[in-house]
């Protein structure tokens, strides 16, 4: 935003469109791996972070495509809002420019592979991949001669700030969960939500409407630690894939960065936008992009393959469908085990049974001990 917003305003872009596209582009990072929201949701849903990242690939591409189609529509039907750059402002495509672009892209691609590639290939856990990402980022900063002790302290301070906040929220959420479970609150929630008409789709529609309005007042950490653990068992009982459920909630919760009263993306944009840009323009410019994010939520609800297509297709075994058959003994019918059966009982006690086999001993008489 610091770089692109002044340039767009300089060449006559509509302020609402310019601020909206910057704010919406920033919120995509909540869905595109490596997203912190996906990591937290994977932990709360008991699913692999790698699977959650794979499931988010499809919706990420869909969201970018929806945004691009909207901009293309405006450039065709409302060209005054997105005017073309004058010829003198356009750079010429030459070998030097290509090499410069590649020189800036390759280190970033390597850093992305250190984090995401190692997770997808099973070479590292998310914690180990995060450590590799830190080492790679510090190496890039050192290569550009920007690695200073002040920068390291700033990074450590930000990390401790976020970690402390998450830990305290987790402690409070755990206390709430213990009390809630002790009062059988989960049974009440399950009974209430399982009766929603429409089956799994009706449940997802209700939950996403609920999460959308809840995000007006709560941060995604509070929603993930308090609300999601109550909804996950119900979703699983309805046969909803928890990866699909988690990615869907992640897409929904990114809207909280675009609408009041918090709208962190809008506040950050207000802090960097020039005074000529009105606050009302920033809020009004976010409305179309917020609508497109909700359209993506609807697409993922009715098209779960956009998430599950990228996942491993290994079938899951439902323990409730396993049937165990115990073979019958002797000639009792059914599947019998060979050479396994009770001794014949057609003889009187103390007498030989049929087929020359010994009968059952007479237990009414005292045992006889032969000297």
Put a short name on every predicted segment.
Residues 1-371:
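Alpha-helical transmembrane segments of multi-pass membrane transport proteins
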């Amino acid at each position: 935003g610091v770089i692109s917003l002044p340039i767009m305003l300089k060449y006559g872009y509509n302020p609402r469109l310019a601020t909206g596209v910057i704010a919406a582009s920033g919120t995509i990072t909540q869905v595109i791996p490596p997203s912190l929201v996906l990591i937290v949701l994977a932990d709360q849903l008991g699913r692999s972070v790698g699977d959650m990242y794979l499931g988010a690939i499809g919706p990420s591409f869909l969201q970018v495509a929806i945004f691009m189609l909207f901009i293309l529509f405006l450039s065709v039907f409302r060209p005054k809002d997105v005017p073309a750059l004058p010829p003198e402002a356009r750079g010429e495509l030459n070998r030097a420019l290509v090499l410069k672009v590649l020189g800036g892209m390759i280190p970033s691609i390597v850093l992305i592979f250190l984090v995401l590639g190692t997770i997808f290939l099973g070479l590292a856990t998310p914690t180990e991949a995060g450590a590799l990402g830190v080492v790679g980022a510090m190496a890039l900063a050192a290569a550009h001669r920007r690695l200073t002790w002040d920068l390291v302290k700033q990074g450590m301070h930000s990390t401790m700030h976020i970690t402390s906040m998450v830990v305290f929220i987790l402690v409070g959420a755990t206390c709430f969960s213990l009390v809630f479970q002790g009062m059988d609150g989960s049974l009440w929630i399950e009974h209430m939500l399982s009766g929603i008409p429409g089956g799994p789709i009706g449940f997802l529609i209700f939950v996403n409407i609920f999460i959308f309005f809840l995000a007006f007042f709560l941060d995604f950490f509070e929603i993930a630690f308090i609300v999601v653990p109550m909804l996950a068992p119900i979703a699983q009982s309805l046969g909803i894939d928890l990866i699909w459920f988690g990615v869907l909630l992640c897409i929904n919760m990114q809207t909280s960065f675009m609408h009041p009263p918090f709208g962190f993306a809008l506040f950050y944009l207000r802090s960097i936008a020039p005074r000529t840009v009105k606050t009302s323009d920033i809020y009004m410019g976010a409305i179309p992009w917020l609508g497109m994010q909700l359209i993506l939520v609807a697409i993922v609800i009715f098209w779960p393959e956009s998430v599950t297509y990228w996942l491993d297709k290994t079938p899951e075994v439902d323990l409730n469908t396993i049937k165990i058959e115990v073979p019958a003994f002797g000639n009792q019918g059914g599947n019998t085990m060979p050479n396994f059966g009770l001794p014949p009982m057609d003889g009187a006690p103390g007498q030989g049974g049929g087929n020359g086999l010994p009968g059952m001993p007479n237990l009414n008489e005292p045992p006889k001990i032969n000297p």
